[in-house]
Amino acid sequence: MNFAKFQQLVEHRTGFRTMENPTASGEYFSDSCGDLYTFFLKVGPGDVIEDVTYFTTGCGFGTATCSLLVELAKGKTIDQALAITDADIEAALDGYPEKKKDYPERSRFALQAAVEDYRAKRAAGQITDAMLEEARATVAAAAAAADRRGNGTTEEDAKAGPKVLEDAGMLTIKLH
């Protein structure tokens, strides 16, 4: 196991946040330890996962594993994300301790639930390609407007939502 990478994942918690207006979401509850894993997806045209975030009540291994899955799934199509295996997640961390080998499966089940939610909404006509294009255009327009105002907000910032920044003891909340 790569402990340095594990520590980095726990400290940075890539993607650890809820998402406002996700295209889809899904959760998995682990009966073995009581952890809840929830994944949120923003899916764009071509079924590309433009953003993926998560929330978990789990420990450091749960957080690290979900962060790894965010890194592996972001920018992939729905089908490519579904093809991510427990072995792929485990390999990204150079293995897991024997007692923690079920963590990749837990996070993957939550991501699969989000994909199933997305597919169900597509099948029911609740999500169309036109809607995905419109959502992408709205985010791009918000980022462009912020750039014109000169506040340095990028399209990625607009997708991410509010940020709390701390500098020299001053706390700033950036709402975009």
Across the structure, where does each feature detected by a protein language model lie?
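C-terminal binding/interaction regions
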Residues: 1-19, 25-26, 79, 86-176
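Active-site- and interface-proximal helix/loop "cap" or "latch" segments in soluble metabolic
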Residues: 31-32, 44, 48-105
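Structured beta-strand/loop patches that form or line metal/cofactor-binding pockets in enzymes
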Residues: 13-46
